[in-house]
Protein backbone atom coordinates (compact mmCIF):
# COMPACT_ATOMS: atom_id res chain seq x y z
CA UNK A 1 0.00 0.00 0.00
CA UNK A 2 2.86 2.34 0.87
CA UNK A 3 4.43 1.79 -2.59
CA UNK A 4 1.11 2.44 -4.29
CA UNK A 5 0.81 5.74 -2.42
CA UNK A 6 4.33 6.67 -3.51
CA UNK A 7 3.45 5.98 -7.15
CA UNK A 8 0.28 8.03 -6.83
CA UNK A 9 2.25 10.88 -5.26
CA UNK A 10 4.79 10.83 -8.08
CA UNK A 11 2.12 10.87 -10.77
CA UNK A 12 0.15 13.56 -8.95
CA UNK A 13 3.24 15.76 -8.91
CA UNK A 14 3.70 15.33 -12.68
CA UNK A 15 0.02 15.91 -13.21
CA UNK A 16 -0.04 19.18 -11.27
CA UNK A 17 3.18 20.65 -12.68
CA UNK A 18 3.19 19.67 -16.34
CA UNK A 19 -0.55 19.77 -16.84
CA UNK A 20 -1.30 22.99 -15.03
CA UNK A 21 -2.81 24.54 -18.14
CA UNK A 22 -5.37 21.75 -18.51
CA UNK A 23 -6.97 21.76 -15.01
CA UNK A 24 -9.67 19.33 -16.12
CA UNK A 25 -9.37 17.24 -12.95
CA UNK A 26 -10.02 18.99 -9.62
CA UNK A 27 -7.14 18.53 -7.18
CA UNK A 28 -9.17 16.42 -4.76
CA UNK A 29 -9.92 13.90 -7.52
CA UNK A 30 -6.41 13.56 -9.01
CA UNK A 31 -5.55 10.39 -7.12
CA UNK A 32 -8.91 8.94 -8.10
CA UNK A 33 -8.37 9.80 -11.77
CA UNK A 34 -4.86 8.32 -11.74
CA UNK A 35 -6.04 5.12 -10.09
CA UNK A 36 -8.88 4.65 -12.56
CA UNK A 37 -6.59 5.36 -15.53
CA UNK A 38 -4.04 2.85 -14.26
CA UNK A 39 -6.77 0.27 -13.80
CA UNK A 40 -8.13 0.94 -17.29
CA UNK A 41 -4.68 0.46 -18.86
CA UNK A 42 -4.11 -2.68 -16.79
CA UNK A 43 -7.42 -4.15 -17.96
CA UNK A 44 -6.74 -3.06 -21.55
CA UNK A 45 -3.34 -4.78 -21.67
CA UNK A 46 -4.58 -7.85 -19.83
CA UNK A 47 -7.77 -8.44 -21.80
CA UNK A 48 -6.93 -7.15 -25.28
CA UNK A 49 -3.20 -7.91 -25.42
CA UNK A 50 -3.23 -11.09 -23.32
CA UNK A 51 -0.52 -9.87 -20.95
CA UNK A 52 -0.52 -11.44 -17.52
CA UNK A 53 -2.30 -9.27 -15.00
CA UNK A 54 0.96 -8.75 -13.10
CA UNK A 55 2.84 -7.50 -16.16
CA UNK A 56 -0.06 -5.33 -17.28
CA UNK A 57 -0.18 -3.77 -13.82
CA UNK A 58 3.59 -3.17 -13.81
CA UNK A 59 3.36 -1.26 -17.08
CA UNK A 60 0.34 0.79 -15.99
CA UNK A 61 1.68 1.69 -12.55
CA UNK A 62 5.13 2.77 -13.78
CA UNK A 63 4.15 4.96 -16.75
CA UNK A 64 3.19 8.14 -14.92
CA UNK A 65 3.54 10.65 -17.76
CA UNK A 66 1.77 8.42 -20.27
CA UNK A 67 -1.07 7.97 -17.77
CA UNK A 68 -1.24 11.72 -17.26
CA UNK A 69 -1.39 12.33 -21.02
CA UNK A 70 -4.24 9.84 -21.31
CA UNK A 71 -6.21 11.57 -18.55
CA UNK A 72 -5.76 14.96 -20.23
CA UNK A 73 -7.50 13.70 -23.35
CA UNK A 74 -10.77 13.22 -21.46
CA UNK A 75 -13.23 15.42 -19.64
CA UNK A 76 -13.38 14.34 -16.02
CA UNK A 77 -16.56 13.35 -14.23
CA UNK A 78 -16.49 11.10 -11.16
CA UNK A 79 -19.52 8.94 -12.11
CA UNK A 80 -18.53 8.41 -15.75
CA UNK A 81 -14.73 8.58 -15.84
CA UNK A 82 -14.13 4.82 -15.83
CA UNK A 83 -16.63 4.37 -18.64
CA UNK A 84 -15.06 7.26 -20.59
CA UNK A 85 -11.65 5.64 -20.27
CA UNK A 86 -12.86 2.28 -21.56
CA UNK A 87 -14.70 3.94 -24.45
CA UNK A 88 -11.67 6.06 -25.34
CA UNK A 89 -9.38 3.03 -25.38
CA UNK A 90 -11.83 1.17 -27.60
CA UNK A 91 -11.75 3.85 -30.27
CA UNK A 92 -8.28 5.33 -29.68
CA UNK A 93 -5.73 2.56 -29.08
CA UNK A 94 -2.63 3.66 -27.22
CA UNK A 95 0.97 3.34 -28.39
CA UNK A 96 1.70 0.38 -26.16
CA UNK A 97 5.47 0.68 -26.59
CA UNK A 98 5.34 4.23 -25.24
CA UNK A 99 3.80 2.99 -21.99
CA UNK A 100 6.20 0.04 -21.88
CA UNK A 101 9.44 2.00 -22.32
CA UNK A 102 8.43 4.58 -19.75
CA UNK A 103 7.43 1.85 -17.31
CA UNK A 104 10.85 0.15 -17.42
CA UNK A 105 12.53 3.33 -16.26
CA UNK A 106 13.33 5.31 -19.40
CA UNK A 107 12.58 8.99 -18.89
CA UNK A 108 9.49 10.00 -20.86
CA UNK A 109 11.45 12.77 -22.63
CA UNK A 110 13.71 10.05 -24.10
CA UNK A 111 11.04 7.46 -24.90
CA UNK A 112 10.55 8.65 -28.49
CA UNK A 113 14.18 7.71 -29.26
CA UNK A 114 13.42 4.06 -28.53
CA UNK A 115 9.99 3.60 -30.10
CA UNK A 116 9.99 1.07 -32.96
CA UNK A 117 9.20 2.63 -36.31
CA UNK A 118 5.59 2.22 -37.47
CA UNK A 119 4.74 -0.17 -34.66
CA UNK A 120 2.24 0.62 -31.93
CA UNK A 121 1.04 -2.72 -30.59
CA UNK A 122 2.87 -5.52 -28.79
CA UNK A 123 1.30 -7.97 -31.22
CA UNK A 124 3.43 -6.44 -33.99
CA UNK A 125 6.69 -7.32 -32.22
CA UNK A 126 6.89 -9.04 -28.84
CA UNK A 127 10.68 -9.51 -28.84
CA UNK A 128 11.54 -6.72 -26.40
CA UNK A 129 8.49 -7.42 -24.26
CA UNK A 130 9.23 -11.13 -23.91
CA UNK A 131 12.86 -10.43 -23.01
CA UNK A 132 11.67 -8.02 -20.32
CA UNK A 133 9.29 -10.66 -18.96
CA UNK A 134 12.16 -13.18 -18.75
CA UNK A 135 14.35 -10.72 -16.85
CA UNK A 136 11.51 -9.70 -14.58
CA UNK A 137 10.67 -13.34 -13.93
CA UNK A 138 14.22 -13.93 -12.70
CA UNK A 139 13.86 -11.02 -10.29
CA UNK A 140 15.14 -7.93 -12.12
CA UNK A 141 13.25 -4.85 -10.87
CA UNK A 142 10.86 -3.86 -13.65
CA UNK A 143 11.67 -0.15 -13.48
CA UNK A 144 15.43 -0.82 -13.78
CA UNK A 145 15.16 -2.68 -17.07
CA UNK A 146 15.31 0.64 -18.91
CA UNK A 147 18.92 1.06 -17.82
CA UNK A 148 19.74 -2.29 -19.38
CA UNK A 149 17.91 -1.40 -22.57
CA UNK A 150 19.61 1.98 -22.98
CA UNK A 151 23.09 0.57 -22.50
CA UNK A 152 22.81 -2.81 -24.19
CA UNK A 153 19.83 -3.28 -26.50
CA UNK A 154 21.18 -6.62 -27.71
CA UNK A 155 20.02 -8.11 -24.41
CA UNK A 156 16.44 -7.57 -25.55
CA UNK A 157 16.71 -9.29 -28.93
CA UNK A 158 17.51 -12.63 -27.29
CA UNK A 159 14.92 -15.34 -26.78
CA UNK A 160 13.55 -15.71 -23.24
CA UNK A 161 15.01 -19.21 -22.98
CA UNK A 162 18.49 -17.93 -23.82
CA UNK A 163 18.26 -15.22 -21.18
CA UNK A 164 17.02 -17.62 -18.52
CA UNK A 165 19.73 -20.17 -19.36
CA UNK A 166 22.45 -17.54 -19.14
CA UNK A 167 21.22 -16.25 -15.78
CA UNK A 168 21.13 -19.77 -14.34
CA UNK A 169 24.72 -20.36 -15.48
CA UNK A 170 25.76 -17.30 -13.46
CA UNK A 171 24.09 -18.87 -10.43
CA UNK A 172 25.94 -22.12 -11.11
CA UNK A 173 29.22 -20.23 -10.62
CA UNK A 174 28.06 -19.57 -7.07
CA UNK A 175 26.17 -16.29 -7.22
CA UNK A 176 22.91 -15.64 -5.43
CA UNK A 177 19.97 -14.34 -7.43
CA UNK A 178 20.34 -10.76 -6.15
CA UNK A 179 24.09 -10.87 -6.81
CA UNK A 180 23.48 -11.90 -10.43
CA UNK A 181 20.91 -9.14 -10.87
CA UNK A 182 23.10 -6.44 -9.30
CA UNK A 183 26.14 -7.46 -11.32
CA UNK A 184 24.27 -7.65 -14.63
CA UNK A 185 22.63 -4.28 -14.05
CA UNK A 186 26.08 -2.80 -13.41
CA UNK A 187 27.69 -4.53 -16.42
CA UNK A 188 24.84 -5.07 -18.94
CA UNK A 189 27.00 -6.64 -21.65
CA UNK A 190 27.37 -9.71 -19.42
CA UNK A 191 23.82 -10.57 -20.48
CA UNK A 192 24.67 -10.70 -24.19
CA UNK A 193 25.72 -13.84 -25.99
CA UNK A 194 22.84 -16.26 -25.74
CA UNK A 195 22.55 -19.19 -23.37
CA UNK A 196 26.24 -20.10 -23.32
CA UNK A 197 28.89 -18.12 -21.44
CA UNK A 198 31.97 -17.14 -23.42
CA UNK A 199 35.39 -17.51 -21.81
CA UNK A 200 35.74 -13.78 -21.11
CA UNK A 201 32.42 -13.47 -19.27
CA UNK A 202 32.92 -16.73 -17.37
CA UNK A 203 36.39 -15.56 -16.32
CA UNK A 204 34.93 -12.22 -15.21
CA UNK A 205 32.31 -13.90 -13.02
CA UNK A 206 34.87 -16.26 -11.50
CA UNK A 207 37.00 -13.25 -10.55
CA UNK A 208 33.96 -11.41 -9.24
CA UNK A 209 32.99 -14.44 -7.16
CA UNK A 210 36.42 -14.49 -5.54
CA UNK A 211 36.22 -10.75 -4.94
CA UNK A 212 32.69 -10.87 -3.53
CA UNK A 213 33.58 -13.81 -1.28
CA UNK A 214 36.40 -11.71 0.15
CA UNK A 215 34.02 -8.81 0.70
CA UNK A 216 31.25 -10.96 2.11
CA UNK A 217 33.56 -12.65 4.60
CA UNK A 218 33.30 -9.37 6.46
CA UNK A 219 29.50 -9.26 6.05
CA UNK A 220 29.73 -6.15 3.90
CA UNK A 221 26.67 -6.81 1.72
CA UNK A 222 23.02 -6.40 2.41
CA UNK A 223 21.14 -9.10 0.54
CA UNK A 224 19.28 -6.82 -1.86
CA UNK A 225 19.69 -5.74 -5.46
CA UNK A 226 20.57 -2.11 -4.71
CA UNK A 227 23.44 -3.12 -2.41
CA UNK A 228 24.96 -5.46 -5.00
CA UNK A 229 24.36 -2.95 -7.79
CA UNK A 230 26.11 -0.14 -5.91
CA UNK A 231 29.27 -2.19 -5.26
CA UNK A 232 29.24 -3.75 -8.73
CA UNK A 233 29.10 -0.32 -10.37
CA UNK A 234 32.20 0.72 -8.42
CA UNK A 235 34.01 -2.45 -9.46
CA UNK A 236 33.02 -1.80 -13.06
CA UNK A 237 34.99 1.47 -13.00
CA UNK A 238 38.21 -0.50 -12.58
CA UNK A 239 37.03 -3.36 -14.81
CA UNK A 240 36.55 -0.89 -17.67
CA UNK A 241 40.01 0.54 -17.04
CA UNK A 242 41.88 -2.76 -17.26
CA UNK A 243 39.81 -5.91 -17.08
CA UNK A 244 42.67 -8.29 -17.99
CA UNK A 245 45.16 -7.12 -15.36
CA UNK A 246 45.51 -9.77 -12.65
CA UNK A 247 47.27 -7.37 -10.26
CA UNK A 248 44.24 -5.10 -10.42
CA UNK A 249 41.93 -7.87 -9.19
CA UNK A 250 44.35 -8.74 -6.38
CA UNK A 251 44.50 -5.09 -5.33
CA UNK A 252 40.71 -4.80 -5.36
CA UNK A 253 40.53 -7.78 -2.99
CA UNK A 254 43.01 -6.12 -0.65
CA UNK A 255 41.46 -2.64 -0.77
CA UNK A 256 37.84 -3.25 0.20
CA UNK A 257 37.66 0.23 1.75
CA UNK A 258 37.72 1.77 -1.72
CA UNK A 259 34.35 0.22 -2.48
CA UNK A 260 32.79 0.79 0.93
CA UNK A 261 33.97 4.23 2.00
CA UNK A 262 33.86 6.09 -1.31
CA UNK A 263 31.00 6.81 -3.66
CA UNK A 264 30.89 5.76 -7.28
CA UNK A 265 31.16 9.42 -8.26
CA UNK A 266 34.29 9.93 -6.13
CA UNK A 267 35.96 6.87 -7.68
CA UNK A 268 35.03 7.98 -11.19
CA UNK A 269 36.34 11.49 -10.58
CA UNK A 270 39.70 10.24 -9.34
CA UNK A 271 40.00 7.71 -12.16
CA UNK A 272 39.06 10.39 -14.68
CA UNK A 273 41.65 12.76 -13.21
CA UNK A 274 44.54 10.38 -13.77
CA UNK A 275 43.25 9.25 -17.17
CA UNK A 276 43.57 12.89 -18.25
CA UNK A 277 47.34 12.51 -17.95
CA UNK A 278 47.13 10.74 -21.29
CA UNK A 279 48.53 7.50 -19.88
CA UNK A 280 46.92 4.09 -20.27
CA UNK A 281 43.66 3.53 -18.42
CA UNK A 282 45.24 0.54 -16.74
CA UNK A 283 48.06 2.67 -15.30
CA UNK A 284 45.54 5.22 -14.02
CA UNK A 285 43.56 2.49 -12.25
CA UNK A 286 46.64 0.85 -10.76
CA UNK A 287 47.86 4.16 -9.33
CA UNK A 288 44.65 4.44 -7.30
CA UNK A 289 44.52 0.78 -6.29
CA UNK A 290 48.16 0.74 -5.18
CA UNK A 291 47.78 4.02 -3.33
CA UNK A 292 44.20 4.24 -1.97
CA UNK A 293 45.21 7.25 0.16
CA UNK A 294 44.89 9.24 -3.09
CA UNK A 295 41.13 9.12 -2.59
CA UNK A 296 41.54 11.57 0.31
CA UNK A 297 43.58 14.07 -1.73
CA UNK A 298 41.84 17.28 -2.75
CA UNK A 299 42.73 17.47 -6.43
CA UNK A 300 40.14 20.11 -7.30
CA UNK A 301 40.39 23.34 -5.32
CA UNK A 302 44.09 24.00 -4.57
CA UNK A 303 45.72 26.79 -6.58
CA UNK A 304 49.15 26.05 -8.01
CA UNK A 305 52.04 27.98 -9.49
CA UNK A 306 53.15 26.09 -12.57
CA UNK A 307 56.76 27.06 -11.89
CA UNK A 308 56.48 26.02 -8.26
CA UNK A 309 54.74 22.75 -9.11
CA UNK A 310 57.40 21.73 -11.62
CA UNK A 311 60.12 22.37 -9.05
CA UNK A 312 58.05 20.44 -6.50
CA UNK A 313 58.15 17.47 -8.88
CA UNK A 314 61.93 17.70 -9.04
CA UNK A 315 62.71 19.69 -12.18
CA UNK A 316 65.92 21.71 -12.07
CA UNK A 317 65.81 25.48 -12.59
CA UNK A 318 67.38 25.22 -16.05
CA UNK A 319 64.72 22.67 -17.06
CA UNK A 320 61.93 24.94 -15.82
CA UNK A 321 63.47 27.86 -17.73
CA UNK A 322 63.61 25.82 -20.94
CA UNK A 323 59.97 24.79 -20.59
CA UNK A 324 58.92 28.38 -19.86
CA UNK A 325 60.71 29.61 -22.96
CA UNK A 326 59.00 27.05 -25.19
CA UNK A 327 55.54 27.17 -23.58
CA UNK A 328 55.17 30.64 -21.98
CA UNK A 329 51.38 30.56 -22.24
CA UNK A 330 51.19 27.69 -19.73
CA UNK A 331 52.96 29.51 -16.92
CA UNK A 332 51.49 31.57 -14.11
CA UNK A 333 48.87 30.18 -11.80
CA UNK A 334 46.29 27.49 -12.44
CA UNK A 335 44.29 25.01 -10.40
CA UNK A 336 45.37 21.54 -9.35
CA UNK A 337 42.31 20.09 -11.09
CA UNK A 338 43.83 21.23 -14.41
CA UNK A 339 47.29 19.79 -13.71
CA UNK A 340 46.97 16.76 -16.05
CA UNK A 341 46.26 18.99 -19.04
CA UNK A 342 48.85 21.57 -17.92
CA UNK A 343 51.45 18.81 -18.05
CA UNK A 344 50.19 17.54 -21.42
CA UNK A 345 50.40 21.09 -22.76
CA UNK A 346 54.15 21.09 -21.98
CA UNK A 347 54.78 17.42 -22.85
CA UNK A 348 55.75 16.46 -19.32
CA UNK A 349 52.70 14.34 -18.48
CA UNK A 350 54.39 10.96 -18.85
CA UNK A 351 57.46 12.01 -16.88
CA UNK A 352 55.43 13.39 -13.99
CA UNK A 353 53.02 10.45 -13.98
CA UNK A 354 55.99 8.09 -13.71
CA UNK A 355 57.14 10.08 -10.67
CA UNK A 356 53.68 9.70 -9.11
CA UNK A 357 53.34 5.98 -9.76
CA UNK A 358 56.85 5.24 -8.46
CA UNK A 359 55.94 6.00 -4.88
CA UNK A 360 55.68 9.79 -5.01
CA UNK A 361 51.91 10.22 -5.26
CA UNK A 362 52.09 12.18 -1.99
CA UNK A 363 53.56 15.10 -3.96
CA UNK A 364 50.03 15.91 -5.15
CA UNK A 365 48.92 16.53 -1.57
CA UNK A 366 52.05 18.16 -0.15
CA UNK A 367 52.34 21.10 -2.56
CA UNK A 368 51.42 24.60 -1.37
CA UNK A 369 52.05 28.09 -2.73
CA UNK A 370 55.19 29.63 -1.26
CA UNK A 371 53.44 32.95 -0.61
CA UNK A 372 50.11 34.65 -1.49
CA UNK A 373 51.68 36.65 -4.34
CA UNK A 374 53.60 33.79 -5.95
CA UNK A 375 53.27 33.81 -9.74
CA UNK A 376 50.60 36.52 -9.81
CA UNK A 377 50.84 38.36 -13.13
CA UNK A 378 49.65 41.94 -13.29
CA UNK A 379 48.52 41.85 -16.93
CA UNK A 380 46.33 38.84 -16.20
CA UNK A 381 44.85 40.38 -13.06
CA UNK A 382 43.97 43.58 -14.94
CA UNK A 383 42.34 41.59 -17.73
CA UNK A 384 40.40 39.53 -15.20
CA UNK A 385 39.12 42.69 -13.53
CA UNK A 386 37.85 43.94 -16.90
CA UNK A 387 36.04 40.64 -17.46
CA UNK A 388 34.43 40.85 -14.03
CA UNK A 389 33.00 44.26 -14.93
CA UNK A 390 31.89 43.37 -18.47
CA UNK A 391 28.29 42.81 -19.53
CA UNK A 392 29.16 39.32 -20.74
CA UNK A 393 31.04 38.39 -17.56
CA UNK A 394 29.68 34.86 -17.20
CA UNK A 395 30.24 33.95 -20.85
CA UNK A 396 33.81 35.26 -20.87
CA UNK A 397 34.72 33.67 -17.54
CA UNK A 398 33.51 30.31 -18.85
CA UNK A 399 35.72 30.71 -21.93
CA UNK A 400 38.64 31.67 -19.71
CA UNK A 401 38.03 28.62 -17.54
CA UNK A 402 38.14 26.47 -20.67
CA UNK A 403 41.55 27.89 -21.60
CA UNK A 404 42.82 27.17 -18.10
CA UNK A 405 41.42 23.63 -18.33
CA UNK A 406 43.48 22.86 -21.45
CA UNK A 407 46.65 24.18 -19.81
CA UNK A 408 46.77 27.92 -20.45
CA UNK A 409 47.93 29.66 -17.27
CA UNK A 410 46.98 32.93 -15.62
CA UNK A 411 49.11 35.16 -17.84
CA UNK A 412 48.85 37.93 -20.40
CA UNK A 413 49.13 35.57 -23.37
CA UNK A 414 46.01 33.73 -22.22
CA UNK A 415 44.11 37.01 -22.02
CA UNK A 416 45.17 37.90 -25.57
CA UNK A 417 44.04 34.49 -26.84
CA UNK A 418 40.71 34.94 -25.04
CA UNK A 419 40.00 38.11 -27.03
CA UNK A 420 40.07 36.16 -30.30
CA UNK A 421 38.11 33.01 -29.47
CA UNK A 422 34.35 33.01 -29.95
CA UNK A 423 31.67 30.56 -28.91
CA UNK A 424 30.53 28.99 -25.68
CA UNK A 425 32.87 26.97 -23.49
CA UNK A 426 31.09 23.80 -24.64
CA UNK A 427 31.59 24.71 -28.30
CA UNK A 428 35.26 25.49 -27.72
CA UNK A 429 35.71 22.15 -25.99
CA UNK A 430 34.06 20.29 -28.89
CA UNK A 431 36.31 22.03 -31.43
CA UNK A 432 39.40 21.28 -29.35
CA UNK A 433 38.32 17.64 -29.10
CA UNK A 434 38.00 17.40 -32.89
CA UNK A 435 41.63 18.49 -33.24
CA UNK A 436 42.71 16.02 -30.57
CA UNK A 437 40.73 13.15 -32.10
CA UNK A 438 42.27 13.89 -35.50
CA UNK A 439 45.66 12.81 -34.17
CA UNK A 440 47.32 16.12 -33.31
CA UNK A 441 49.09 15.79 -29.98
CA UNK A 442 47.81 17.86 -27.09
CA UNK A 443 50.81 20.18 -26.71
CA UNK A 444 50.82 21.00 -30.43
CA UNK A 445 47.14 21.93 -30.37
CA UNK A 446 47.84 24.40 -27.57
CA UNK A 447 50.72 25.83 -29.61
CA UNK A 448 48.43 26.21 -32.61
CA UNK A 449 45.85 28.01 -30.49
CA UNK A 450 48.50 30.34 -29.10
CA UNK A 451 49.67 31.17 -32.66
CA UNK A 452 46.23 31.31 -34.32
CA UNK A 453 43.45 31.51 -31.68
CA UNK A 454 40.76 31.78 -34.35
CA UNK A 455 41.27 28.09 -35.03
CA UNK A 456 38.82 27.55 -32.18
CA UNK A 457 36.18 29.63 -33.96
CA UNK A 458 35.72 27.03 -36.70
CA UNK A 459 32.81 24.62 -36.52
CA UNK A 460 33.70 20.95 -35.93
CA UNK A 461 32.66 19.75 -39.41
CA UNK A 462 34.65 22.60 -40.98
CA UNK A 463 37.78 21.62 -39.04
CA UNK A 464 37.35 17.99 -40.09
CA UNK A 465 36.87 18.92 -43.76
CA UNK A 466 39.98 21.12 -43.79
CA UNK A 467 42.13 18.48 -42.13
CA UNK A 468 40.83 15.87 -44.56
CA UNK A 469 41.64 18.16 -47.52
CA UNK A 470 45.12 18.91 -46.15
CA UNK A 471 46.05 15.26 -45.71
CA UNK A 472 44.12 13.99 -48.71
CA UNK A 473 44.04 16.23 -51.76
CA UNK A 474 46.99 18.38 -50.71
CA UNK A 475 48.99 15.31 -49.74
CA UNK A 476 50.53 16.90 -46.68
CA UNK A 477 50.61 15.81 -43.03
CA UNK A 478 49.11 17.32 -39.90
CA UNK A 479 52.61 18.46 -38.97
CA UNK A 480 52.29 21.20 -41.58
CA UNK A 481 49.91 23.00 -39.24
CA UNK A 482 52.92 23.84 -37.08
CA UNK A 483 54.30 25.81 -40.04
CA UNK A 484 50.97 27.35 -41.05
CA UNK A 485 48.45 27.13 -38.17
CA UNK A 486 46.24 29.80 -39.77
CA UNK A 487 45.39 27.27 -42.50
CA UNK A 488 42.43 26.20 -40.39
CA UNK A 489 41.08 29.76 -40.28
CA UNK A 490 40.53 30.10 -44.05
CA UNK A 491 37.37 29.10 -45.90
CA UNK A 492 37.73 25.71 -47.56
CA UNK A 493 35.23 26.11 -50.39
CA UNK A 494 35.91 29.73 -51.31
CA UNK A 495 39.64 29.99 -50.64
CA UNK A 496 41.67 26.89 -49.89
CA UNK A 497 40.21 24.44 -52.39
CA UNK A 498 39.85 26.66 -55.50
CA UNK A 499 43.28 28.24 -55.07
CA UNK A 500 45.02 24.93 -54.52
CA UNK A 501 43.29 23.29 -57.47
CA UNK A 502 44.09 26.23 -59.71
CA UNK A 503 47.75 26.13 -58.67
CA UNK A 504 47.80 22.40 -59.38
CA UNK A 505 46.21 23.02 -62.79
CA UNK A 506 48.80 25.70 -63.63
CA UNK A 507 51.65 23.31 -62.83
CA UNK A 508 50.07 20.41 -64.73
CA UNK A 509 49.48 22.58 -67.82
CA UNK A 510 53.02 23.94 -67.72
CA UNK A 511 52.03 27.55 -67.06
CA UNK A 512 53.96 27.69 -63.79
CA UNK A 513 57.28 26.05 -63.07
CA UNK A 514 57.35 27.29 -59.49
CA UNK A 515 55.68 25.23 -56.79
CA UNK A 516 54.30 27.49 -54.08
CA UNK A 517 53.82 26.43 -50.47
CA UNK A 518 50.34 25.92 -49.08
CA UNK A 519 50.77 29.04 -46.96
CA UNK A 520 51.71 31.10 -50.00
CA UNK A 521 48.78 29.75 -52.00
CA UNK A 522 46.18 30.27 -49.27
CA UNK A 523 47.32 33.23 -47.17
CA UNK A 524 48.25 35.63 -49.98
CA UNK A 525 45.73 38.46 -50.24
CA UNK A 526 43.33 38.45 -53.17
CA UNK A 527 45.07 41.45 -54.75
CA UNK A 528 48.53 39.88 -54.48
CA UNK A 529 47.19 36.54 -55.67
CA UNK A 530 45.73 38.07 -58.84
CA UNK A 531 48.95 40.02 -59.41
CA UNK A 532 50.91 36.78 -59.17
CA UNK A 533 48.62 35.17 -61.74
CA UNK A 534 49.02 38.17 -64.06
CA UNK A 535 52.77 37.82 -63.76
CA UNK A 536 52.52 34.26 -65.04
CA UNK A 537 50.44 35.34 -68.05
CA UNK A 538 48.03 38.27 -68.58
CA UNK A 539 45.22 35.87 -69.56
CA UNK A 540 45.53 33.69 -66.45
CA UNK A 541 43.41 35.90 -64.10
CA UNK A 542 40.48 35.70 -66.53
CA UNK A 543 40.75 31.94 -66.53
CA UNK A 544 40.81 31.94 -62.71
CA UNK A 545 37.65 34.00 -62.42
CA UNK A 546 35.75 32.06 -65.08
CA UNK A 547 36.67 28.50 -64.18
CA UNK A 548 37.99 28.23 -60.64
CA UNK A 549 36.89 30.94 -58.27
CA UNK A 550 33.18 30.14 -58.54
CA UNK A 551 31.89 27.50 -56.13
CA UNK A 552 29.48 26.31 -58.81
CA UNK A 553 32.20 25.34 -61.25
CA UNK A 554 35.23 24.48 -59.18
CA UNK A 555 34.33 20.79 -58.87
CA UNK A 556 33.80 20.38 -62.63
CA UNK A 557 37.21 21.64 -63.79
CA UNK A 558 39.34 19.04 -65.55
UniProtKB/Swiss-Prot annotation:
* A molecular-function term among this protein's GO annotations: double-stranded DNA binding
Its Gene Ontology cellular component terms are:
mitochondrion
Q: Where in the cell is it found?
A: Mitochondrion
Q: What is the effect of changing residue 105 to D?
A: In shot1-1; short hypocotyl when grown in the dark
Q: Name one Pfam family in it.
A: mTERF
Q: Name one GO biological process term.
A: regulation of DNA-templated transcription
Q: Transit peptide located at which residues?
A: 1-58
What InterPro entries does the record tag this protein with? Answer: MTERF (IPR003690), MTERF_sf (IPR038538)
Give the main localization category: mitochondrion
Gene disruption phenotype? Severe growth and developmental retardation. Dwarf plants.
The entry's function note states:
Transcription termination factor involved in the regulation of mitochondrial-encoded gene expression. Essential for normal plant growth and development.
Which family does the UniProt entry place this protein in?
A: Belongs to the mTERF family.
From the Swiss-Prot or TrEMBL record, give the protein name: Transcription termination factor MTEF18, mitochondrial
The organism is Arabidopsis thaliana (Mouse-ear cress)
Amino acid sequence: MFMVRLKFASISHNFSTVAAKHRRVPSKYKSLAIGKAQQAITDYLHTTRSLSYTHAEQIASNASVSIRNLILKLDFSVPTFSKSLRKHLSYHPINEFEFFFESIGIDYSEVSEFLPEKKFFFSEDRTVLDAAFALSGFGFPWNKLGKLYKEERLVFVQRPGEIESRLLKFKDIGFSTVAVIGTCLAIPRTLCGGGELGSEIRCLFVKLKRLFDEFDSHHLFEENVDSWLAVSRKIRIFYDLGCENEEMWELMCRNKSLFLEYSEEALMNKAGYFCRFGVSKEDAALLILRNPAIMNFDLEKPVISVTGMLKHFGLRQDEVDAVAQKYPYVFGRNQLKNLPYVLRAIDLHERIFDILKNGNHHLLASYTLMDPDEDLEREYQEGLEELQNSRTKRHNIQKLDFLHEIGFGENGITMKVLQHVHGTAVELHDRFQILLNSGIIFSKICMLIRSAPKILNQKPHSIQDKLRFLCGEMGDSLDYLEVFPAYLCFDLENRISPRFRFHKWLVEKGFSEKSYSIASIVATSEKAFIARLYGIHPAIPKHWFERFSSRKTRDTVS
